[in-house]
UniProtKB/Swiss-Prot annotation:
Name by which UniProt lists this protein: Multifunctional methyltransferase subunit TRM112-like protein
Lineage summary: Eukaryota, Metazoa, Chordata, Craniata, Vertebrata
Residues that bear Phosphoserine: 119
Gene Ontology molecular function: protein heterodimerization activity; tRNA methyltransferase activator activity
UniProt entry keywords in alphabetical sequence: Cytoplasm, Nucleus, Phosphoprotein
C-alpha cells in the first residue's frame, strides 16, 4: 500500500463518520519500490493530499525527508516533486495494520493490500 493510497482511505464503521480519518498506520514490513517519475501526476495530486495525515504516516515510517507543508511554487520545483514522488508512490507498506481513530477497528495490510471489508454489523445503513 502506497502512502498516497493511505492518504485517501478512511474507516466506514457505522457511527464513525468523518472522524474515521486518518487511519493510524502501523507497518511491520516496508519496501522502497522504484516508480518512474511523473511530475505532472505529482503536481495534480499535491492539492488532494491531506498533509497532516501524510506527516503522521511518514513519521510512523521514520521518513525524515517529508516537508512540513507544500512549498510555494512547488509545481516548478523538481527537487520537491521528486521528494513527494518518493514518499507518495515509492514507499510501499507490505505488511501491517490501519486503525480507525474513532472506533479502534483494526484493518490488516497483507502483501501490500489493505483489507477494509466490514461485517454486516459494522456497516452503515
Amino acid at each position: 500500500m502506497r502512502l498516497l493510497t493511505h492518504n485517501l482511505l478512511s474507516s466506514h464503521v457505522r457511527g464513525v463518520g468523518p472522524r474515521g480519518f486518518p487511519l493510524r498506520l502501523q507497518a511491520t514490513e516496508v519496501r522502497i519500490n522504484p516508480v518512474e517519475f511523473n511530475p505532472d501526476f505529482i503536481v495534480r495530486m499535491i492539492p488532494k493530499v491531506e498533509w497532516a495525515a501524510l506527516l503522521e504516516a511518514a513519521d510512523h515510517l521514520h521518513l525524515i525527508q517529508v516537508p512540513k507543508e507544500p512549498i510555494q511554487g512547488y509545481e516548478h520545483n523538481e527537487e520537491f516533486l521528486r521528494k513527494m514522488h518518493h514518499v507518495l508512490l515509492e514507499v510501499e507498506v507490505l505488511e501491517g495494520t490501519l486503525q480507525c481513530p474513532e472506533s479502534g477497528r483494526v484493518f490488516p495490510i497483507s502483501r501490500g493490500i489493505p483489507n477494509m471489508l466490514l461485517s454486516d454489523e459494522e456497516t452503515e445503513t
